[in-house]
C-alpha cells in the first residue's frame, strides 16, 4: 500500500472514532432532575455500548514508528530502532511469508538491538576499528585494564621527569590496545635521570625498602633482557635530634640494556659487601641515620606476566603514595655536562658546609657496580677543619669490629682522596652559620659581650683558639673539639657587631640578677675612690645635670664593678674601661626614666676641678646663667621596684656619708625654703622635710584680735537667741488674738452686739 493510501486510511479511522465518542456522550449524559422535588442529583452513567467496531483498545504496540507516518524517520544508521511489521487483515500474504511474519511477531518490541560488545573495538586513533579483534577472555581484559590504570598513577606524580616503569612483554594474545600501551611504556624506560628525593618519615623509608625488595624479587629463568641501574647515593641527616628525621638523597640512575642469561647471578664485590653490612649495623644501632633504599634490578619476564605485573604495580604504588603524603619530591633531568658545570660553580664551597648536618656514609646501592663520586675543587686552607669534622663524625658512628670499621675506612679513603663530594644545584649554602656549642648559663652568656677583652680577642685572629678554648672549658666540664671552637668564634663575631645595642639590655639583666650583698660591698669599696673623682666635678659644674646621663653612668658603674670583682680580671684594668664606657654610653644610650636613684653619691666638693668635654662646659654655663630665672625642680618619686632595689641595697653603704649633711640641714631652721641637693637620697629627704617644720612667730596683736572676735561672735549668738524667744512669744499672742476675733461671730455674742 502506498503512502497516500495509508495516510487516508488513518484519517478516516480517526474521524470514525471521534463520531462514535460523540454519540456515546449524547446517550450517556447526566440526567438532571428538577430541584423542586428535592430529589438528589443522579450522576449515574449508563452501561457502555457493546459490540462497537471502533472501540478504543490498549493492546497496540508502543514502538517509535507505529502510528507515525512515513515522513517521520530517524537518520541513525548505527542504531537499529526498527519495529516488527504489523499484521493487517486487508493484505494477503503468501504461505512463504507467514513463517517470517510469525518469527518477527515473537520478538520482544522493547529489545535494544545495539551491540555493546563493539565498544571493545572503539579507538580514538585515525585507523577505523577492526571488528572481530576481541580478547580471548574477559578476565584478561579486566586485569590488563586494572594494571594499566594502577601503573598510570605513578605517572600522575609530579616528579618533573618520566620515571622508568618496567612493563611485561606483551604476548600474542593481547589486544592492540595492550600493545600500544606497552609500547608507550617501553619508550620511557631508556632515559637518564637525576633525582633528589626527600623523605621525612621512617615509615616511608621502610615502605620503600620493602617495595624495592619485592621489585627485585621478580625474576625469570627465561628472561632475555635485564635492566640494571647504577645508583650513586649520598645520605644526608641533620645532627639535631629535635627536628623530624630528614632523609635527603641524590641519586643518578642510568638505565642500561644488557643481554644476559636469566639464570646468571652477579657476585657482589667485597667493598659492596662491607658497606652493606656497615649500613645494616647502622640501621640497627643508630636510629638517627637513614639510608636510601637501593633500586634493585628490573627484569622483563614473559612467563607468568600477570603476577609480576601485579607485584610491580602494588609495590611502586605504595612507595609513591607514601612519598607523596610525606613530602613533595623534587627531581631534575641532568646530563653529565650540566653536572660538571655545577661542579665548577659550587667548587668554592667547602665540604664542611654539607657535612655540617650529615651522618652516614657513601655507599653503592647496586650489586656489582663500582662507586663513583664527583670531585669538587676545595681550597687547601679548609682541609684541616674538614678532616677534623670527618673524624668527629666517625667517632659518633657505631663501631662494630667486623663490619663498621671497614665502612669507616672506605669513607675516610674516599673523603681524603681529593675530598670528592657530590654537588647538585639543590644543595645550597646555608644563610646563617650554625653553632654547635651548647648554651651556657644566662649570666655567663650575657657578660661575655660586655667585656671588651673577650670581644677584642674574638675579632683578633691570633688568639682565637686560646681565648675561646678557655671560655668553652669554663662553661662546660668536658672538652670541646675544633668544630665547637669554630662555631663559638662565629657566634661571638656576630655578637660583636651589635655590642652597642646589646649592652643596655645585658646590663639591665645583669643588674637585676646580681646579689644584694655583693653589690653593697662593691659600691662601698669603690664609690669613695674612682666614682667620686669622675662624678663630683660633673655635679659641681652642672648643678642639676640631666638625670638620664647620670643614670647611664651609674648603671655602668654597677656592671663594671661586679665584673671587675672577678679573679680573672685585675682591678687596675677596671678604671680605663669605666671611663671609656661612660663616654660611649653617654652618646649611644637613650635617656632612661628620671628618678632619684643617684642621690646616694657623696656630697659636692667645690675645690675639685672639672674634667668634661667642651659641649658639657657650654651646657653648664648656660644652665648657671639661667638658674636664677628657672623655678626649682620638683622632687621626683621613685617607682616601687626602684625603691626596693636601690634603697634596700644602698642603705648601709651610704648611711655614714649623710650624717654630716643631716646635722648641717637640721641647724638651718629659717623661713627660707630648704634647697634640695642631688646628693641626698629621697628616703632621707622625706624624713628631714617632715622634721624641719617652719615655726610661726607668736604675735600678741593677732591673739588679742582673735579673742575680741570670738567675744563678739558669742554676743551675737546670745542676741539671736533672745530674738528667737521673743518671736515665739509674739506668735503665741497672735494666735490668741485670732481666736478672739473668731468668737465674735458666735450667736451668743450677736445679741450683745446688737444692743450696742
Curated annotation (Swiss-Prot):
InterPro entries listed in its UniProt record: At4g18490-like
Ranges of compositional bias, category Low complexity: 125-139
Keywords for this protein: Coiled coil
Residue spans of biased composition, Basic and acidic residues class: 8-20, 90-99, 583-608, 619-629, 663-675
Highest taxon, organism lineage: Eukaryota
Region described as Disordered: 1-20, 81-109, 121-157, 170-269, 562-644, 656-681
Residue stretches of biased makeup (Polar residues): 189-208, 230-251, 562-582
Coiled-coil boundaries: 701-741
Classification via PANTHER family: BNAA03G58330D PROTEIN (PTHR36380), OS01G0755100 PROTEIN (PTHR36380:SF1)
Name of the protein: Uncharacterized protein At4g18490
Lineage, highest ranks first: Eukaryota, Viridiplantae, Streptophyta, Embryophyta, Tracheophyta
Amino acid at each position: 500500500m502506498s503512502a497516500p493510501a495509508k495516510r487516508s486510511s488513518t484519517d478516516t479511522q480517526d474521524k470514525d472514532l471521534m463520531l462514535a465518542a460523540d454519540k456515546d456522550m449524547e446517550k450517556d449524559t447526566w440526567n438532571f432532575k428538577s430541584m423542586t422535588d428535592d430529589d438528589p442529583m443522579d450522576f449515574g452513567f449508563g452501561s457502555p455500548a457493546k459490540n462497537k467496531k471502533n472501540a478504543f483498545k490498549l493492546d497496540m504496540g508502543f514502538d517509535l514508528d507505529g502510528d507515525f507516518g512515513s515522513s517521520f524517520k530517524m537518520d541513525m544508521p548505527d542504531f537499529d530502532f526498527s519495529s516488527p511489521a504489523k499484521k493487517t487483515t486487508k493484505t494477503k500474504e503468501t504461505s512463504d511469508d507467514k513463517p517470517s511474519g510469525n518469527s518477527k511477531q515473537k520478538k520482544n518490541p522493547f529489545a535494544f538491538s545495539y551491540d555493546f560488545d563493539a565498544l571493545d573495538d572503539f579507538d580514538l586513533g585515525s585507523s577505523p576499528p577492526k571488528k572481530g579483534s576481541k580478547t580471548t577472555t574477559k578476565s584478561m581484559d579486566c586485569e590488563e585494564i586494572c594494571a594499566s590504570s594502577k601503573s598510570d598513577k605513578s605517572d600522575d606524580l609530579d616528579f618533573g621527569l618520566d620515571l622508568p616503569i618496567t612493563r611485561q612483554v606483551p604476548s600474542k594474545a593481547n589486544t592492540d590496545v595492550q600493545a600500544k600501551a606497552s609500547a608507550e611504556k617501553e619508550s620511557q624506560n631508556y632515559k637518564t635521570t637525576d633525582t633528589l628525593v626527600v623523605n621525612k618519615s621512617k615509615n616511608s623509608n621502610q615502605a620503600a625498602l620493602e617495595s624495592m625488595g619485592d621489585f627485585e624479587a621478580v625474576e625469570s629463568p627465561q628472561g632475555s633482557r635485564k635492566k640494571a641501574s647504577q645508583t650513586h647515593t649520598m645520605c644526608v641527616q641533620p645532627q639535631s635530634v629535635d627536628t623530624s628525621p630528614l632523609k635527603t638523597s641524590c641519586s643518578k640512575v642510568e638505565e642500561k640494556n644488557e643481554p644476559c642469561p636469566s639464570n646468571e647471578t652477579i657476585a657482589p664485590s667485597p667493598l659492596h659487601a662491607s658497606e652493606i653490612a656497615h649500613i645494616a649495623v647502622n640501621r640497627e644501632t643508630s636510629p638517627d641515620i637513614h639510608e636510601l633504599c637501593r633500586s634493585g634490578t628490573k627484569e622483563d619476564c614473559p612467563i607468568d606476566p600477570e603476577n609480576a605485573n601485579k607485584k610491580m604495580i602494588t609495590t611502586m604504588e605504595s612507595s609513591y603514595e607514601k612519598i607523596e603524603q610525606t613530602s613533595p619530591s623534587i627531581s631534575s633531568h641532568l646530563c653529565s655536562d650540566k653536572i660538571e658545570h655545577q661542579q665548577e660553580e659550587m667548587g668554592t664551597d667547602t665540604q664542611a658546609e654539607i657535612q655540617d648536618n650529615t651522618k652516614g656514609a657513601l655507599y653503592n646501592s647496586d650489586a656489582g657496580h663500582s662507586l663513583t663520586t664527583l670531585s669538587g675543587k676545595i681550597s687547601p686552607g679548609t682541609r684541616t677543619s674538614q678532616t677534623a669534622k670527618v673524624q668527629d663524625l666517625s667517632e659518633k658512628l657505631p663501631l662494630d669490629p667486623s663490619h663498621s670499621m671497614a665502612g669507616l675506612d672506605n669513607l675516610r679513603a674516599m673523603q681524603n682522596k681529593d675530598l670528592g663530594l657530590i654537588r647538585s644545584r639543590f644543595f645550597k649554602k646555608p644563610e646563617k652559620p650554625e653553632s654547635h656549642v651548647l648554651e651556657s648559663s644566662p649570666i655567663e652568656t650575657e657578660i661575655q659581650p660586655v667585656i671588651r677583652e673577650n670581644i677584642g680577642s674574638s675579632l683578633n685572629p691570633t688568639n682565637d683558639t686560646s681565648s675561646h678554648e678557655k671560655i668553652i672549658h669554663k662553661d662546660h666540664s668536658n672538652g670541646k673539639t675544633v668544630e665547637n671552637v669554630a662555631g663559638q668564634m662565629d657566634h661571638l663575631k656576630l655578637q660583636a657587631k651589635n655590642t652597642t645595642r646589646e649592652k643596655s639590655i645585658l646590663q639591665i639583666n645583669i643588674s637585676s640578677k646580681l646579689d644584694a650583698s655583693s653589690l653593697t660591698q662593691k659600691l662601698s669599696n669603690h664609690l669613695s675612690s674612682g666614682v667620686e673623682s669622675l662624678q663630683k666635678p660633673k655635679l659641681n659644674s652642672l648643678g642639676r645635670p640631666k638625670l638620664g646621663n647620670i643614670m647611664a653612668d651609674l648603671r655602668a658603674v654597677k656592671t663594671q664593678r661586679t665584673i671587675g670583682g672577678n679573679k680573672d680580671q685585675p682591678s687596675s684594668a677596671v678604671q680605663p674601661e669605666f671611663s671609656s664606657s661612660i663616654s660611649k654610653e653617654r652618646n649611644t644610650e637613650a635617656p632612661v626614666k628620671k628618678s632619684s636613684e643617684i642621690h646616694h653619691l657623696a656630697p659636692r666638693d667645690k675645690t675639685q676641678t672639672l674634667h668634661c668635654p667642651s659641649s658639657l662646659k657650654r651646657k653648664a654655663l648656660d644652665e648657671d646663667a639661667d638658674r636664677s630665672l628657672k623655678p626649682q625642680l620638683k622632687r621626683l618619686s621613685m617607682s616601687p621596684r626602684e625603691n626596693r632595689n636601690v634603697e634596700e641595697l644602698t642603705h648601709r653603704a651610704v648611711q655614714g656619708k649623710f650624717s654630716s649633711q643631716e646635722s648641717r640641714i637640721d641647724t638651718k631652721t629659717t623661713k627660707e625654703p630648704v634647697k634640695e641637693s642631688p646628693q641626698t637620697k629621697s628616703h632621707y629627704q622625706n624624713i628631714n622635710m617632715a622634721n624641719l617644720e617652719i615655726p610661726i612667730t607668736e604675735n600678741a596683736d593677732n591673739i588679742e584680735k582673735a579673742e575680741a572676735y570670738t567675744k563678739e561672735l558669742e554676743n551675737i549668738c546670745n542676741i539671736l537667741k533672745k530674738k528667737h524667744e521673743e518671736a515665739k512669744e509674739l506668735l503665741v499672742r497672735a494666735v490668741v488674738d485670732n481666736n478672739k476675733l473668731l468668737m465674735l461671730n458666735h450667736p451668743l455674742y450677736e445679741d450683745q452686739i446688737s444692743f450696742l
